[in-house]
Amino acid sequence: MAKIKKDDLVQVISGKDKGKQGKVLRVFPTDERVLVEGVNRVTKHLRAGQDNNGSTEGGLQVVEAPIHISNVAVVDPETKKPTRVGYRFETVEKDGVTKTVKVRFAKASGKEL
């Protein structure tokens, strides 16, 4: 189970892009990989051919490639540093009804994510 979700701000903690921060665009849970904005950019060679709209030009295109989930850490909203993620149960009262909800929080500061 991945503790990193879409739209989380993460920092790369190992690899060629170590230290870079970006927003998670997509999570691939079966492959344990995440697609992070501006990180692990690779050059893709496109062949000239056809697509749904007609013909396409060939050439080079720079795109983000997925990175393994163990190489990124969620950024703490308070300290702006990478942190681990924990879960806790909080009671919320809404319209006179008390509910228990599971909440993700940053272990370094205790702030809710």
From Swiss-Prot:
One of its GO terms (cellular component) is ribosome. It comes from the Bacteria. PROSITE patterns: RIBOSOMAL_L24. One of its GO terms (molecular function) is structural constituent of ribosome. Keywords: Ribonucleoprotein, Ribosomal protein, RNA-binding, rRNA-binding. Pfam families: KOW (PF00467), ribosomal_L24 (PF17136). GO terms for biological process: translation. SMART domains: KOW. InterPro entries: KOW (IPR005824), Rib_uL2_dom2 (IPR014722), Ribosomal_uL24 (IPR003256), Ribosomal_uL24_CS (IPR005825), Ribosomal_uL24_KOW (IPR041988), Translation_prot_SH3-like_sf (IPR008991). Part of the 50S ribosomal subunit. One of two assembly initiator proteins, it binds directly to the 5'-end of the 23S rRNA, where it nucleates assembly of the 50S subunit. Belongs to the universal ribosomal protein uL24 family. This is Large ribosomal subunit protein uL24.
